[in-house]
Amino acid sequence: MPLYTTKKSNKLRASMFDEKPAKDYDPEAEPRDGDDDQSGSEADSDVERAETEHYVTVGKSKLRKAEAPTLGPEYSGTRVSRKALEESDEEDFEDEEEDDEEDDDDEDDLEDGESETGSEEFADPDTADLERDHIDEDAEISSDNALGEDDADWAEKFTFRGSSKPKTPAKTSKKDDLAVRIKKRPTAADFMSGSEDDEEEEDDEEDLEEDEEDEEDSEEGEQNGLFDMEAEETEDDEGEDDEEELDGALLSGSDDEEGDSEEDDEDDEEGSGDEDEDEDDEDEDEDEDDESGDDDEKNDVNAELRKIMAEDEKKIVSTFSKAAEADAQKGVAVRSQRRIFDSILNLRIRLQKALIAANTFNCVEKPENFKEKPYEAAEEAAVKLWNTIDSVRNSFLPEQVKAKAGEKRKRDAIELDTPAQEIWEVLEAVEGPANKYRRQVLDKWSTRVRSTTASMTKERRLAQSAGSQSLVSVLDDQLLSADRLIKKARTPRSCAPAQAAKKVEEDADIYDDADFYQLLLKELVDQRSSDSAAPGESVATVRWAALKEAKTRKQVDRKASKGRKLRFTVHEKLQNFMAPEDRRSWEEHAIDRFFGTLFGQKMVLKEDEAEAEAAEEDEEMGGVNVEEAGLKLFRS
């Protein structure tokens, strides 16, 4: 790119970057007239000025150019002229040009020097900074400067690869232990004599001195900037020869201790070499065996763990299955108990009519034509019922109770001619042992279900102190006042309606357990109508259920208001309906005329049509009035 060296070129370059504002075109602006029309324009301007004197000057339209936001005084800066800007730009360009010219002169001088000498000039080795020149190259670093102060901690534990005796051998697995044992194996150097050790130390000292001399020579070569590659190769060869000599001395050191000949030494060396190879092979085999043994042990452990887990799962499943079976058996037992209770309650409800009939026997008078046959049939049915109840009752008793009650001999059924005293003795013989068994069963189950009866209502509690006493003791306390209970059972209520209608206070020939019967019915209704009542709360009764139902909101379609839905009632379909058929011989007009002239009176039906027809008939009859000439019934 060419350089602009003159002021004119700088201004031209600066003008290239100037942004010129775009000029808006105003269609309302009038074109500018020439100089020839100046005289005429003055006259026209006077006229226009007179016509536009009442105009008010307004600002420019904001639609064309928006006004700039007004800033405060803190945003105001110093005004700079364009001349000052151009002068500052010219000074900057002049400085850049001077720098470029100096660089060009330096390059030209370098090219001229190379062309004259024909080779590159090197800096003075005494004054040159070699470290700066070789800062990017891979120069050798002395061992003293290789590590810093911060690297001392981890460098203490660091060991080079191939070292025979590490400071802290890691013992993480069997493989690592085996490697440590291999490294600790004695070598030929361990069996060398003291003289050989001294010779080795002297050789090592000589080698160290030679190495130091080599390092000094290399440092001098680096300072001069010349590296003799051949000298380095010879030094490397000498170092390798020294190492080979040391290895040979180490391997051939065992012959001086034993005092054997050179042949024995050769045999020993061959034997030791073979032994080392054999030991290496054995070590590899041992490593493989150890690895295979470790894999087998892991597989065995995993198999044992799987077996134990499977056994534990089986035990857990068996325990859960047993618990589930026990719960299922309990549920089945509870359902069977509830079913038995419901069946007994159903039997009691059905016996209510029979009890009412039995209580009304004494109030019914015997008719004159009373026959014995129906009475005998009822007696036979009662005896049969008693035998059935007795057999069912005996079936619930265990064998021990039956033996005590004298059930070893075969029981005979009661017949019609069996006296009442014998029937009573049979009942007492069975009631004694059965009472003891019944009390044991009540005690057993009352203790088991005592915790579940905490939510029992007051009506169902037999006593307020039932929580501290057993069920049998509570029943005994209730039966102590037997006279009160007997009197209450002989008072006529719902089970003796005939005596209750006659307002009899007490009757010895009846049995009325209306209180207990009402309690059973109430429990049944509560069981059917109760929802899921919370523990500790009373069970909902029928009355409460009715009140709850009354409080619930009715299901009403609230979107059907304001005519948004059509309200209609679907009528039932008409069945066996036949529409009447018109089988009359008279026409409707004749029927209307007949009823209109009935009893000598003319009834006006459809006045307009009647007048029009009357006028037509008058015209047809030649102006004679039809009504006057017509026949009228019952005319006087």
Curated annotation (Swiss-Prot):
Cellular component terms (Gene Ontology): nucleolus
Extent of Acidic residues compositional bias: 33-45, 87-128, 136-153, 195-222, 229-247, 254-298
Top-level taxonomic group: Eukaryota
Location relative to the cell: Nucleus, Nucleolus
UniProt keyword list: Nucleus
Any single GO BP term: maturation of SSU-rRNA from tricistronic rRNA transcript (SSU-rRNA, 5.8S rRNA, LSU-rRNA)
Region (Disordered): 1-303
InterPro entries named among the record's database cross-references: AATF, AATF/Bfr2, AATF_C
Alphabetized Pfam families for the sequence: AATF-Che1 (PF13339), TRAUB (PF08164)
Family: Belongs to the AATF family.
The protein, known as: Protein bfr2
Organism: Neurospora crassa (strain ATCC 24698 / 74-OR23-1A / CBS 708.71 / DSM 1257 / FGSC 987)
The organism's taxonomic lineage, starting at the top: Eukaryota, Fungi, Dikarya, Ascomycota, Pezizomycotina
Gene: bfr2
